[in-house]
């Protein structure tokens, strides 16, 4: 380039900048720059007269630390100068004669010289093929540069260590694992063991902290010598002796500590770490533990959009719901119940009847036929029914009908929020969905239903419910918070509902918080309130725990076999190892794996697909891969802000992003119109979560498809065989063999025992 930083002609004309007046390489007349002025200029640490700067002046200059005249220092002057790069006669400790650091002539130096060398030449800061701290010819570029501890600055390379692509870590890399060189001990440099296992005497570590230039110094060649070496510009200290993390003593690591181990950070007890602690997580002290405050204020959809958004027409397989066996059990010998075959028999108000019809409901499903009259008669209920069978309406409609009939509503005259019904959900998205479902049924009535969940701006959320809310639906943490501060008053609560109850009771933390809520002094005891629990899965252990919240004469409603999969969903399985998953996914979506292109007529553009993964980073990685293949994809997971999560669901619902890549936050309860295909890129940890995931398709009798990637170490194979059999679907031969305990000839080529792999919502 003709106007490089070190070009002598440009440097003479410029007023500021690297190598110009007032700039990083010195000025022309009296300029104060990083390299001193031409006459009388002061630079980085310069003096008063004769200009002593970081690059020295032209006359009588002295460098970094030099004297007033003729001194020697960092980039000495024209005469008798010496220092960092030396002057014309003063030797060449760094960079050779006549090439001082900001040197004496236009030949070369800090801010001058030829294009091919010098500060800012074609090769970068310092000339040659590489520049100042450059990883590949740029100022601070690549993995090292100007200012980074250890390398001299620049941005750190965060690409995958395995494939060198951005957006994920090597542990999440979908590419085949590359061979690595054998690792050696950090202490003795011998292979076969790590430094903590090393039997050699521990070697002291070299200093690594400091400032400008980092541990590898400005201009050094790998050691700790050089400009800014051993701590950088301004120096640093050598690292002190290693201390044990457990006892803070010197001379050993925590793994070798003779003192008793420190207790769990959460509860203080020994024997486990905080991430394994069975006790509820304690709030962290200080600003750092509080996290950023939520600022999201949602824009509510108008009612016509709400009615249309979640209106799913009955599919051709709708009658399959009515083939299921219905089983009622109770401590009472007989339960006097007449199923309501139509909504006209459900004792709904005239306005609610119209709203139900407007919402697209025409015929009651089995869970609705039995739950509607049982709730109306005042029974506590534990209900289990297939995904997509209308459980939300089964508890909302009778609750709202009874409250309206009794004129038992939270009004402004009560002076605060006295809800008659509390509905708890495991995720924010499900809470928002139930809220909108309730808005439909309560349309043009006097009933107010409000959402309360994390991610919403606290002030906004509080202001909404202080106006009064007969029904509150939300997540446990935020509701508990408002109860504790007195915003939500539970004195008049008549109904307590747990949706996805098995997850609410079984998940660590949820159960304890639920107990806290029901045990508040203001909360009516279970004998004086009605408790309802609904889910598509209800393991025996959870049923046992759930009984503590229910009255003795509660009714258990089981539609078909407890925990059975939706029969409207065709379940398929792809045998593949981890390294093969990415290509399998691309093939399923109609993407050419060689060219990363997609035909415009591909179904992926017209049908909605949900892809479930276990890790947030993998969700973002796959979305990036699909987007590069011109497939509109978006993610939803716990690390995204609520504004982003809500927008992701909105775009998926309206079809502008036909592929949604999700973690566990989207596996339960979400009722999204037009989801044709669910792909389990990563299998869940348990069979119940599998049932819920595939239940995002096949809603209200519409046919759906679920494809799961099964690897050799999947622990769910035997349970999957049972799920397929219960759903009256064909079990592949290789899965039958695997369910017996060995994969055999029909499995993965050898007899390998099934291995259980080792092991997401705040408010």
UniProtKB/Swiss-Prot annotation:
Q: Where is this region: Disordered?
A: 1-30, 193-230
Protein name as it appears in the record: ATP-dependent RNA helicase glh-1
* Species in which this protein is naturally found: Caenorhabditis elegans
Task: Note whether Cell cycle occurs among the keywords.
Answer: no
Q: Which residues form the Helicase ATP-binding domain?
A: 372-556
Please tell me where ATP binds in this chain: 385-392
Query: What does the record note on quaternary structure?
Result: Interacts with csn-5; this may prevent glh-1 degradation induced by kgb-1. Interacts with zyx-1. Interacts (via the N-terminal region containing the four CCHC zinc fingers) with pan-1. Interacts with kgb-1; this may promote glh-1 degradation by the proteasome.
Observed effect of gene inactivation: Mortal germline (Mrt) phenotype in which there is a progressive decline in fertility with each generation at 25 degrees Celsius. RNAi-mediated knockdown in a glh-4 mutant background results in smaller P-granules and irregular cytoplasmic localization of the P-granule component pgl-3 in embryos. Quadruple RNAi-mediated knockdown with glh-4, pgl-1 and pgl-3 results in offspring that display 27-89% sterility, abnormal oocytes and do not have embryos in the uterus. These sterile offspring still produce sperm.
Instruction: Give the motif span (DEAD box).
Output: 499-502
GO function term, MF aspect, one: zinc ion binding
Q: Which domain of life is it from?
A: Eukaryota
Q: What does this protein do?
A: Probable ATP-binding RNA helicase. May act redundantly with the P-granule component glh-4 to regulate the formation of the granular structure of P-granules in embryos. Plays a role in positively regulating the localization of pgl-1 to P-granules. May play a role in transgenerational epigenetic inheritance. May protect somatic cells from excessive apoptosis during normal development.
Localization recorded for this chain is:
Cytoplasm; Cytoplasmic granule; Cytoplasm, Perinuclear region
Q: Which Enzyme Commission number(s) are listed?
A: 3.6.4.13
Keyword set for this entry?
ATP-binding, Cytoplasm, Helicase, Hydrolase, Metal-binding, Nucleotide-binding, Phosphoprotein, Repeat, RNA-binding, Zinc, Zinc-finger
**Post-translation changes:** Phosphorylated by kgb-1 (in vitro); this may be responsible for its degradation by the proteasome.
| Catalysis: reaction(s) | ATP + H2O = ADP + phosphate + H(+)
- ZnF endpoints (CCHC-type): 158-175, 183-200, 242-259, 262-279
Annotated Gene Ontology cellular component terms:
cytoplasm; nucleus; P granule; perinuclear region of cytoplasm
Identify the residue span(s) of motif Q motif. Answer: 341-369
Work out whether the entry's keyword set contains Cytoplasm: yes
Q: Which residues form the Helicase C-terminal domain?
A: 592-739
Extract the Gene3D superfamilies matched here. P-loop containing nucleotide triphosphate hydrolases, Zinc finger, CCHC-type
Region 7 X 10 AA tandem repeats, Gly-rich, residue ranges: 24-93
Residue span of motif Phosphodegron? 423-427
């Amino acid at each position: 380039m003709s106007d490089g930083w070190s070009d002598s002609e440009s440097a003479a004309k410029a007023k500021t900048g690297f190598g110009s007046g007032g700039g990083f390489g010195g000025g022309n007349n009296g300029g104060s720059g990083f390299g001193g002025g031409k006459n009388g200029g002061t630079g980085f640490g310069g003096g008063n007269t004769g200009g002593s700067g970081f690059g020295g002046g032209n006359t009588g200059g002295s460098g970094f630390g030099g004297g007033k005249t003729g001194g020697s220092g960092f980039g000495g002057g024209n005469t008798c100068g010496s220092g960092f790069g030396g002057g014309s006669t003063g030797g060449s400790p760094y960079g050779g004669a006549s090439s001082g650091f900001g040197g004496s002539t236009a030949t070369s130096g800090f801010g001058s010289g030829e294009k091919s060398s010098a500060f800012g030449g074609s090769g970068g800061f310092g000339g040659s093929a590489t520049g100042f701290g450059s990883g590949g010819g740029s100022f601070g570029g690549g993995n090292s540069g100007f200012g980074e501890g250890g390398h001299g600055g620049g941005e750190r390379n965060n690409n995958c260590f395995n494939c060198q692509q951005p957006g994920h870590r090597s542990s999440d890399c979908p590419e085949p694992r590359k061979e690595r060189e054998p690792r050696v001990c950090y202490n003795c440099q011998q292979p076969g063991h790590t430094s903590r296992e090393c039997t050699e005497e521990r070697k002291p570590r070299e200093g690594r902290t400091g400032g400008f230039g980092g541990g590898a110094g400005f201009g050094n060649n790998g050691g700790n010598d050089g400009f800014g070496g051993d701590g950088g510009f301004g120096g640093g200290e050598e690292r002190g002796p290693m201390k044990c993390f457990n006892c803070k003593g010197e001379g050993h690591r925590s793994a070798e500590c003779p003192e008793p181990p420190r207790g769990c950070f959460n509860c203080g007890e020994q024997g486990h770490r905080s991430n394994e602690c069975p006790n509820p997580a304690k709030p962290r002290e200080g600003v750092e533990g509080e996290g950023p405050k939520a600022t999201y204020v949602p824009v509510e959809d108008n009612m016509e959009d709400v009615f249309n958004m979640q209106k799913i027409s009955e599919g051709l397989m709708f009658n399959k719901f009515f083939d299921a066996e219905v089983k009622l059990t109770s401590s009472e010998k007989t339960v006097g119940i007449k199923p309501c075959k139509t909504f006209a028999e459900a004792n709904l108000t005239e306005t609610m009847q119209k709203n139900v019809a407007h919402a697209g409901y025409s015929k009651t499903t089995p869970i609705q036929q039995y739950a509607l009259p049982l709730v109306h008669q005042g029974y506590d209920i534990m209900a289990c029914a297939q995904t997509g069978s209308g459980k939300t309406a089964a508890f909302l409609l009778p609750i709202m009908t009874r409250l309206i009939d009794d004129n038992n509503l939270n009004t402004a005259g009560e002076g605060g929020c006295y809800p008659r019904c509390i509905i708890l959900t495991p995720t924010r998205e499900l809470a928002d969905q139930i809220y909108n479902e309730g808005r439909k049924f309560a349309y043009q009535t006097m009933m107010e239903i409000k959402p309360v969940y994390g991610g919403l701006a606290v002030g906004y959320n509080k202001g909404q419910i202080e106006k009064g809310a007969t029904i509150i639906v939300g997540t446990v943490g935020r509701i508990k918070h408002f109860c504790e501060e007195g915003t939500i008053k539970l004195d008049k609560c008549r109904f307590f509902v747990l949706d996805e109850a098995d997850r609410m009771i079984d998940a660590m933390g949820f159960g304890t918080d639920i107990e806290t809520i029901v045990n508040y002094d203001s909360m009516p005891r279970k004998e004086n309130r009605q408790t309802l629990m609904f889910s598509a899965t209800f393991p025996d252990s959870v049923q046992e725990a759930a009984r503590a919240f229910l009255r003795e004469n509660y009714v258990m409603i089981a539609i078909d076999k407890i925990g059975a999969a939706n029969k409207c969903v065709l379940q398929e399985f792809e045998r593949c190892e981890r390294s093969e998953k990415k290509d399998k996914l691309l093939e399923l979506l109609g993407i050419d794996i060689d060219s990363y292109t997609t035909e415009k007529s591909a179904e992926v553009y017209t049908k909605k697909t949900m892809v479930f993964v276990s890790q947030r980073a993998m969700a973002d990685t796959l979305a990036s891969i699909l987007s590069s293949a011109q497939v509109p994809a978006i993610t939803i997971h716990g690390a995204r802000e609520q504004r982003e999560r809500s927008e992701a669901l909105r775009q998926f619902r309206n079809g502008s992003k036909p592929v949604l890549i999700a973690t566990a936050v989207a596996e339960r309860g979400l009722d999204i119109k037009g989801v044709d295909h669910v792909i389990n890129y990563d299998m869940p940890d348990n069979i119940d979560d599998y049932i819920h995931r595939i239940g995002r398709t096949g809603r209200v009798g519409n046919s759906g498809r679920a494809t799961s990637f099964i690897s050799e170490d999947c622990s769910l194979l035997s349970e999957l065989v049972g799920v397929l059999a219960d759903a009256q679907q064909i079990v592949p031969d290789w899965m039958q063999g695997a369910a017996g305990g060995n994969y055999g000839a029909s499995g993965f080529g050898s007899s390998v025992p099934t291995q259980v792999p080792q092991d997401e919502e705040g408010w």
